[in-house]
């Protein structure tokens, strides 16, 4: 056994030794082949006809060839035989040596490679024969330094053999075919793979050139490289106006440049409204109380960048299999809208589903897709600007659109994506629902709405009820003359204020019905006309025992603003929802309007009843598509940018408008509020926040309409005590009598009416307050 192991070990040693010698021999041959190739290449480069050579006999003292006389003979021989092909002969020899000796670690012997070597040798000969023949036909004697011909003697013989049969064109075609076959056999190159690789690189190069030169196809790229006069003769570029162009179905094949819409220049009215536009003592705030915007407004994108961005959008959509062309671009203060004309048969929903992928590929925070643009057959793609512009309250309130608005309930929402001011009328909404997450700009937008109301209306035109559970946002307006009651911070007081609004709504409806008018504008016009005619109308709802009833006065608009009504829904419960729905259904004609905001856009806060009766919504940035659908009944708010970026859904419209809300500084709000406090003192209405005990809403409204028990008046056993209490406290209201003596609303109302008839208290004034006329007993 030991002998066997020894024999086996000796045999393995011999195999390893032979393999090692074979490897070294192959490496040595490879080095010799490379050296021969380098020698021949240098000899060919330094060839000169004055040197001695194989094709001629000459005696010289000095050989010009760098490789000496041997190199001169060798170079002369190869050039004489194959002509210009001699210059690639060294490279072919080096390549053949590298192919033959490269796999030095293979276990197979050289004889097993003979079929492959024979094919490579055949390819080598085909390259020399076909290449030299082509050189002999087309190059000939171009270079006088050659010993014979551009194709050598071999090329001349091959050309003379084929030329009489196939002529020049046929001979060249046959030789090119054999040359390509020879390259394939010698190098192993696959022409199909080469063409496929060439096509892929050509597409990549085309995309790169398209982005750089503003083209999207080879046709576009070729035309973009032509002189401008040639381009004008080749194609007429359509001018895309503000109206939608009539695009044919193959519009994607047309050469078109997207229209870059110019930013609008806002018309600023510099003069101040220091005098009221109506009768009264109060004056409107001055615009100088607000901070003017900086004048250095720089565009976020230049026109060239917008053109390049348009092409990039088209290319990114093409990467996802969507063919589209940008036909118009609308740059704005915060976002830029690209209007896309989709190819025929492409659904807009495909683009919508790619919003996140497009945002990633375009390297932006978010992308919003507008599937329907009214009046146009395109879709919108909104991208955030790299430099965001700050929209200030001054530049919106100072615009011609706001200053020329006739309504006293004009709201300034901000600017749209094109930079145009968005001015709306609260009276036409007639109520507004605002929702958005914390930090999205909701409270700042409420301040902007409040300022736009205060800059349009005096206390004679507008009265406010502000509900602020946070005790921070709206408390700065405490003490302004527009308030009906101090800023409400307790949610139970807020419910009482809404109940008072219901009673006031019913009272106004009864007044309008008695005059035969349909809304508060008709009522005020009729009352004003009667006053100017010298025959004022009397209040039909109040009868006086002595003298005549009080005269009717114009009724102000009433706006209830709640910064967070979700707390009301939690604390008070379903009763608040019933009150809100009742006001939303009927209060428009009575001149009572609601603006409710919440940071919890959930179905338990924004209920179906509230949504059905408040069709106008403003959605700021939310965290999910579900929250967006809760507010707008559609997605989109989750793609907003925050900081005042909002979607405004107008009544009767299913397409929200993107608006950038104005930024209002705390200092500006303080200055305006202080100005209003100095101009006039507040005139609060007593009893608005008085609670009504356990009386439910139906009984409350029935009492407000005059129903219930007939007991009351001077015959009431509590009348004397009530008169004494009123004279002592110097305050009177139905709610205070009801709360003090624990009686029903209708009974307390009759006691107050009896006091008015007896001259103890004055008739109800325009703001609902009464004055105690009876002297104090002290």
UniProtKB/Swiss-Prot annotation:
A Pfam family this chain is assigned to: FtsK_gamma
Principal location class: membrane
Origin: domain of life: Bacteria
CDD domains documented for this protein: TrwB_TraG_TraD_VirD4
Molecular function (Gene Ontology), one example: ATP binding
Transmembrane portions of the chain: 28-48, 81-101, 122-142, 146-166, 172-192
Residues that hold ATP according to the record: 439-444
Keyword Cell division on entry: yes
Residues of the FtsK domain: 419-629
GO cellular component terms given for this protein: plasma membrane
Annotated localization: Cell inner membrane
Stored InterPro entries: AAA+_ATPase (IPR003593), FtsK/SpoIIIE/SftA (IPR050206), FtsK_4TM (IPR025199), FtsK_alpha (IPR041027), FtsK_dom (IPR002543), Ftsk_gamma (IPR018541), P-loop_NTPase (IPR027417), WH-like_DNA-bd_sf (IPR036388)
Membrane topology: Multi-pass membrane protein
Cytoplasmic side: 193-778
Keywords recorded for this protein, A-Z: ATP-binding, Cell cycle, Cell division, Cell inner membrane, Cell membrane, Chromosome partition, DNA-binding, Membrane, Nucleotide-binding, Transmembrane, Transmembrane helix
GO biological process, one term: cell division
Job of this protein: Essential cell division protein that coordinates cell division and chromosome segregation. The N-terminus is involved in assembly of the cell-division machinery. The C-terminus functions as a DNA motor that moves dsDNA in an ATP-dependent manner towards the dif recombination site, which is located within the replication terminus region. Translocation stops specifically at Xer-dif sites, where FtsK interacts with the Xer recombinase, allowing activation of chromosome unlinking by recombination. FtsK orienting polar sequences (KOPS) guide the direction of DNA translocation.
Notes on the domains: Consists of an N-terminal domain, which is sufficient for the localization to the septal ring and is required for cell division, followed by a linker domain, and a C-terminal domain, which forms the translocation motor involved in chromosome segregation. The C-terminal domain can be further subdivided into alpha, beta and gamma subdomains. The alpha and beta subdomains multimerise to produce a hexameric ring, contain the nucleotide binding motif and form the DNA pump.
PANTHER family in alphabetical order: DNA TRANSLOCASE FTSK, SPORULATION PROTEIN RELATED
Protein name per its UniProtKB record: DNA translocase FtsK
